[in-house]
Each structure stands twice: as C-alpha cells, then as structure tokens.
Amino acid sequence: MKMLCWRLALWLAAWAVCGKPSFCSALDYDYTYDFTEEDKAEAIDYKDPCKAAVFWGDIALDDEDLKIFQIDRTIDLTQHSNERLGHNTGGFGEHGMSKKRGALYQLIERIRRFGSGFEQNNTSKGRTTVKFSGKNEKNRFPRAATSRTERIWPGGVIPYVIGGNFTGTQRAMFKQAMRHWEKYTCVTFIERSDEESYIVFTYRPCGCCSYVGRRGNGPQAISIGKNCDKFGIVVHELGHVIGFWHEHTRPDRDDHVTIIRENIQPGQEYNFLKMEPGEVNSLGEPYDFDSIMHYARNTFSRGMFLDTILPSRDDNGIRPAIGQRTRLSKGDIAQARKLYRCPACGETLQESTGNFSSPGFPNGYPSYTHCIWRISVTPGEKIVLNFTTMDLYKSSLCWYDYIEVRDGYWRKSPLLGRFCGDKLPEVLASSDSRMWIEFRSSSNWVGKGFAAVYEAICGGEIHKNEGQIQSPNYPDDYRPMKECVWKITVSENYNVGLTFQAFEIERHDNCAYDYLEIRDGMNENSPLIGHFCGYDKPEDIRSTSNTLWMKFVSDGTVNKAGFAANFFKEEMMCQPDNGGCEQRCVNTLGSYQCACDPGYELGPDKKSCEAACGGLLTKLNGTIPTPGWPKEYPPNKNCVWQVVAPTQYRISMKFEFFELEGNEVCKYDYVEIRSGLSSDSKLHGKFCGTEVPEVITSQYNNMRIEFRSDNTVSKKGFKAHFFSDKDECSKDNGGCQHECINTVGSYVCQCRNGFVLHENKHDCKEAECEQKIHSPNGIIMSPNWPDKYPSRKECTWEISATPGQRVKLTFNEFEIEQHQECAYDHLEVFDGESEKSPILGRLCGSKIPEPLIATGNKMFLRFISDASVQRKGFQATHSTECGGRLKAETKPKDLYSHAQFGDNNYPVQADCDWLLVAERGYRVELMFQTFEVEEEADCGYDYVELFDGHDKTAMRLGRFCGSGPPEEIYSAGETLLLHFHTDDTINKKGFHIRYRSIKYPDSVHTKK
C-alpha cells in the first residue's frame, strides 16, 4: 500500500515521530468523574491513556515524545487562561489538567529546553511557529505509509475485555458499537482469550479516552467514563482504537472549515491546531464533514450558540452539519477499509438468516476476484450454511478457483472445507457463532459461480470448558416466539459455573411470559435451579455435576434486550473433607466458605463453630433481649435471631427498652432488623444510641434480628417483644405481581406507575405511555416511579383544564439523566395540545425546575429515555391558575370563572385578569351564559369588572355582581380586559361567559 488515508495513516506517522500518541476524548464531553473504591480494584495492568506527561490537543505525550515531536503553533499561547478548562458540549476537566497556563505550555517549554534540531521563527502579533530545521526534517520523519505498520491490528482482529464495573446495559451497548464497526468494515472484535495485545473497556478519570491504534506488548485501555456510555461516543472511541484521529486536524482543513478563535474558551485554543503536511497523507480522500471523528460546531465554545468550527458553504450555499455521533459516515467506512485492506467484494452478515453469492451470479464471475463474507450471529447460536448453487472451475486440490469455509472469525480459523467444481457441498455447521467464507478466482473459465443461504440456530449441545451464551439477537431485543435449549458439558470431575453479565427479560413475578429456565443436569427433568426473568441479574450458578441445562423462551408480545452469560468449568472446593469446616461448607465460584447452623457462630479460625446468642424462634410471640440483660451486654458479640411465623402471617417488633453505644452512624454497636432470614434480606433499619425505634413489621412471615458489639464500650442493651398477625398478602404477595394492599377480610392488587392491571386483577403489564388528563389538578409521574424509569420509553401527557384557566406544572421531585443540551433522557413541556405547540422547556438533570405555566387551558408533556442511563425520574403536580391572554375568534369560545365550575363554588381571595384580544378590525363580544356572584349594592365584595382596553387605565365598562349584566357587552376596540375579584367570605357558583370577535362599527358597548 503506497499511501494511507490521512486520518488512519496519521497514527502511523505519529508513531514514527512520537512512539506514543494517545487520544483522550474527555476533551469532547463535559462530564465529572466520581472515583470510588470499586474502581481501584481493576486487576488488569493495562496501559492507561490518562497517565501522560502532557497533552497536545487530544494527544498524550511522554518525555521521549517531547524531544522529537513537531507542531504547527499558529496561535498566541500567551493569552491562555489560568482557569479550569472545559466547554459547553464537553470539558477538559477529567484529565486533571487545570494547571496554570495549560499543559501545552509544558510541551513548548520542553521543546525550547531541548533546542537541538529545531528552528523557532517569530511571526507578527507575537505568534510563534515551532518546526524542525530542514536538515533534520527529512531524517526524523519518514513517510507514514511504510514506517510502523505494526500499529495496525493484525488481520483486523481486535481482542477485547469489558471491565467488571459496567452494567449489563452498558456492556450490551459496547457490543452494539463493535458490531457497528464490524458490519461496515473488515475489522473484527473478539473476546480476548490468550492474545497478548488487546483493549480493555474501563472507567478512568479522563472520561472518554483511548490510545490511537494498536499499542502492542499487552493490554491498552479504552476509558468510557461517567456519562460517556452513549452508542455514538463509544463508536467514536473505537475509531481511535482502530486508527482514526480527528478530522479537523488534517493539514487541508482550512480549505473546508474556519476556526473562529475568539469564540474558543480561554486555554483551549491548542485543541484546534492542525497537523503538518509532512506528517500525514490524505490519499486524495475528500474532507469528511459527516465523519463521526469530527468536532461539533460549538466544541470548546465560550457559549452554546457560538461557533468554534464553521464549515464552508457547499455549492448550494448550505453549511454542512458536523459533529454527528450516531453512525459511521461513508468516509469513515471507506478509509477504514483502505487501512485494513478489506476486499472490495463480500460483506459482514449479522442477521439470523441471509444469503450471498459470487459476483455476477448467475451470469459468471470475473477472473482474479477475491471476496470475503463474515457471518456473525449471537454467541450461543450456531451457523448452518447451505450452498444452493455451485459452478466453479474445477482443478486438482481446488487450486485456482475455490471457496473456503472456516469455523471461526478469520482466515486462520479451522477449515470446514475447500470447494470447487459443480458438486454441491454438504450442509456445513459452525461450532460457534462465527463463520468465515473466502472466494478466490484466478482462471479465465466462465461459470455461474455460487449461491448460498445461512441460518442461525439457537441452542444445541456444547462440549467446552468455557464459553459464552446469549439470548438470540443480543445485544438487540430478542425475537418473539423463540425457544432455545442449551446442554452444556465440561470435563469430568468438574462442575459448570455460570455468571451473568447482563439480564433483561420481560418482568413477571411468576415468569409466565418470557423466561430463562436453568436445571442442574442434562435434560428438562433435572432438578430445577431457577426460572428467571425481570431486570435483576441472577446470582452466580454452580451445577453439582459436569452438565447444565438451559432453556430460553419468549412469547409474541414484549421483547427486551435479553441476557449474556459466561460458563466455565468449576472445581467443587468443599470436597472431599467438607473444606475443613466444622458444620457447613458453602461452595462459591472459585472458592468456598464455612458457615454455622442457627444458634452458632464462626470462631476466630473461620472454620469452627461455637455457641452463640440468637437462634431460631417459631412461636407466635415472645421476647428478645441482648445477652446479659438487664446487665450490660458483653463485647465482641454477634447474635442472630431468626423469627419464623406460619404462612400468611407477618411479624411485628416493638422495643420496650433501648440503649446501645453509638449515635446516628451506628459504626460500633448496633442491631439490624430485616424481612427475611438471610444477611442480605430487605433491611428495615440499623439502630443504636438511646432513641427507641418505632414498631417494625416484616414484609413476610419471617424476620432476622442481628446484634453486634465491638470490643470497647458496652451499654445495657435492649429488650424487645415480637408478635405475629395474619396477613393475606404475605403468601406469594397475594398473587399480585407488583403491590398487594391489605383490606379488611380481603386484599387488592395494585400496579406501579407505567403499568396496568391485567384482566385477572393480579398481573401487571407495561402500559402505553399516553395519558389524557381532564382533572383540574393531580399528580404526574415518570414511568415506574419512584423506581428508576425504564430505558427506551416515550410517554406523553395531554392536560386539558377548564376553558379560561391556565395549566400550571409544579415539580416536587426531579432526577433525569444530565446533559447540557438534554440530548439523551429529557422531559419536554409544550404550551398547547401537542408537541407542535410552542415549547415551555426541555428539562433534564437533578435540579428541580421552576414552575411552568401555560398561556391557555392546555399543556402537553413528552418524556423520552434512551437505551443507557436511567434515573429516578420526576413527580409533578398539575393545577390551574385563572387569568391570561385569550384570542377572540369568530367562532364562540368559553370562559369559566374557576377550574371547578359546576362542581364547587369559586375560591375566596381571588384576583384574576383575562385580556381578550380580537384581530384588527374586529371587536370583542361577551355573552353571559351563567352569572352568580355575591350580591352587594355597590358590588364591593365579589365582582366582575370590565375595561374597554388592554389594562385598567382604559374606560371602565362596568362592575357587575349578583346576577350580572342583563345583555351582551361589546368592546369599542380590539381588546377587552375582564377582572374578577373575590373577598374572604361568601362565595357563589361563579360565571360562564362565551366570547367571540365580530365586526361592529359603532362605539356602543351594550346591545340596545
């Protein structure tokens, strides 16, 4: 390959120059990073792109790089701000690069200090260009096309590992991004087995961050930091892994975009430097405005609506859009295919069924053709390939024209067969989820060619010691009406271990619709381990033999993302001597732990058991004191009482006396009360100090009380009484899927917000998220409130209040995924009956918004969540306010005194102003349909006052109370103000007015 496209070849050039370029796209996204202890537990010693000496723009440089790196320094660096770096769509803060005057100063100072081999040319206005001298430039910068090709991933195969601190939804999205690259290029991502070089998805302080190209000699990180877990952002980061740099840094960029430096945030100017022509070769590819690697127009901008990069107008006078983060552009695809020398013929097939054929089929294939098809389906599925036509030149050993089918992801995978001639091959099946088909022709013989069809088959027998199983079509939604059965067998004398990375199957308490069934053995009659559905990952599973049976079933309605699980062989650690445990040995994946029977506790050696306080209590009522009561409890005690009542009973605990060491923190001595018998059951409370806890009632028919004391201060302790009472909801939640509400002698089932009760009055189904609200006030909540709202949801609320009233929305709680432009999850509020009405606000984040008031009696809300981050959502109150600006038209409209007209009298202490406005040349006509306002001779208490204009300085048309004006009222002009006042005592029914606009030439205000 004589040349490499500039963006992809650039990292080769940089490697020849620097040896260690890096990209950190925390520059692109303004997110903070919360470092936790969990993040410190990364076991892989990978190359961390966040730990660079300095950054030049998006490039990480070390001390070695600084000696030989050249830049085009075309900006006045003396103007850099000393403030912390950041910008509207993305910040530089995650790098910790808030040092005075910016990290680029460190680079320039080091270059000046080394001196040798550089020329420094002073230009006008204090600007400086730092370049290599001519005698060194030729030797120090060989052409990128042939210098360091080892930075390309061999065969386009990129092994990966996803760190343990990502959720199942995030893992699924990472795989979707990798499959996106695979679909349009010949790059392949595989789960790492024993490869030396691979990438690690991790969560680092620099936010979104990656090296450019293959580092080699071990793992390298691709950091997906806080709020960077978006499909387009991950596709962008993977572009750097493959070899892409930013589009706007190519040498010819000034022919296509204009950098508006006065709009750039102080200290961020160096992010807009461009590369030297001698460092890259663009291969004649046009500038790609649509590239997923291009900065947006307002990146590092002083303000959201100020451009920092302005695209040049095209032939039609239109400025192209830049900065998209949704999919690969045609230019991205073309350049990746050139770098990795993808064959011009063939494609990546990812559907569950498909077909392909030789070029020109059935009219003959050309000579010297090379095509590659890669079939990639869901792990856990197998591929069945069937050739329907075969007509190739036949030669000995199929030397000239042939098709090779390989059982795997690349050209070195095991060969399933090499075919030529006109004999149809047997049906071929893969052992896993990938298949490689390569076609070559080197003869001049003309034949039809070939055609083939394939199908992905879920389930089957698996004889491997480790592997992965996923639901069909994962990470996308599984398909309806599927049934897949896997039979896993590992080596003899081992068990099967199963861990889940992601789990999202349609929720139902009895898993009646979609489910995953797992059995401890080889068939459907083996002991049941569990029926699983919902969104919680099942606990790690371990079989008792070397076989495990799994069945996945989906019905024809709701489809979810499904599951991803790893299986592996496991050794039974408790055998043959019970693990050295005195009483019970509990196998865990990769290890074991000792446990004791109720009434006993582990000794200091963690294997022996000794008598303890606590125990199993099965009476309907009784007393529980601390050890030594009424004297002080001893130090270093751990007591567990397990109270079990009959089915359909609940247990209540009431403390008579309470005195433990500690305060609100409860760090030293404490008592924990849980519903359930295990240490991870639902916690009702952790108590210490001297305040007596309130009465606690269990959810079910058992309760766990655990008391702990440390080795220092001891107090008198506590004395508590427990008693049991029958509860219809305690058995199987009364058969209710969501909530069971006890009533006298019975119970009712209730569903959470966003769900509706099934016809059987027990189950809950996801509801359509469309509500029409006509009540004057009420509560609006996000779906599944107060739990986190679901992903991929769109909900609307259409609020209609009494005509003449304005809808008001007040937020009580608010927590929606944060983004400066609310581009991901958000709530939109419109001033009218639909999303076409004027918008009142687009809301996200955790700050409670100010109340929103519509100009009329209608308001439209739309809530949208994407596929990744979920938050608690929102709860808001809708109500009404009187008054407002009303448009009078020729068709009559209604105006009511208050929102509950007809149901309740008007409120006291009200002051409402309605301004009725007609079109130019028209007047306003009022027709009183109903009028009942407190009567008084001078209308001094409650009254309606009319003004012939837009405010109260206009001529007053009258003040009315009692039964109101006897006839219609007209304005002289285009506006009429109606003022309604009530005092704090008597109130009446109110009024109903119909108003319209009419042509009326006279100045008379009442009808004669």
From Swiss-Prot:
Q: Name one GO molecular function term.
A: metalloendopeptidase activity
Compartments, record wording:
Secreted
Q: Which residues form the EGF-like domain?
A: 570-610, 725-765
Any one GO CC term of the record: extracellular space
Q: Which residues form the active site?
A: 237
Q: Which residues form the CUB domain?
A: 345-457, 458-570, 613-725, 769-881, 882-998
Enzyme Commission code: 3.4.24.-
Task: Report the SUPFAM superfamilies cross-referenced here.
Answer: EGF/Laminin, Metalloproteases ('zincins'), catalytic domain, Spermadhesin, CUB domain
Task: Specify the signal sequence span.
Answer: 1-26
Q: Where is the Peptidase M12A domain?
A: 144-343
The record's remark on the cofactor is: Binds 1 zinc ion per subunit.
Residues the record lists as binding Zn(2+): 236, 240, 246
Q: Which residues form the propeptide?
A: 27-143
**What's its top-level EC category?**
hydrolase
Q: What is its main location?
A: secreted
Q: Which cofactor does it need?
A: Zn(2+)
Q: Which domain of life is it from?
A: Eukaryota
**Annotated disulfide bonds:** 186-342, 206-228, 208-209, 345-371, 398-420, 458-484, 511-533, 574-585, 581-594, 596-609, 613-639, 666-688, 729-740, 736-749, 751-764, 769-795, 822-844, 882-912, 939-961
Q: Which GO terms describe its biological process?
A: cell differentiation; dorsal/ventral pattern formation; protein processing
Record key words, sorted: Calcium, Developmental protein, Differentiation, Disulfide bond, EGF-like domain, Glycoprotein, Hydrolase, Metal-binding, Metalloprotease, Protease, Repeat, Secreted, Signal, Zinc, Zymogen
Q: Which InterPro entries match?
A: BMP_1/tolloid-like, CUB_dom, EGF-like_Ca-bd_dom, EGF-like_dom, EGF-type_Asp/Asn_hydroxyl_site, EGF_Ca-bd_CS, MetalloPept_cat_dom_sf, Peptidase_M12A
Question: So which residues have sugars stuck on them?
Answer: 122, 165, 355, 386, 621
**What does the UniProt function comment say about this protein?**
Protease which processes procollagen C-propeptides, such as chordin, probiglycan and prolysyl oxidase. Required for the embryonic development. Predominant protease, which in the development, influences dorsal-ventral patterning and skeletogenesis.
The identity of this protein, by name, is Tolloid-like protein 1
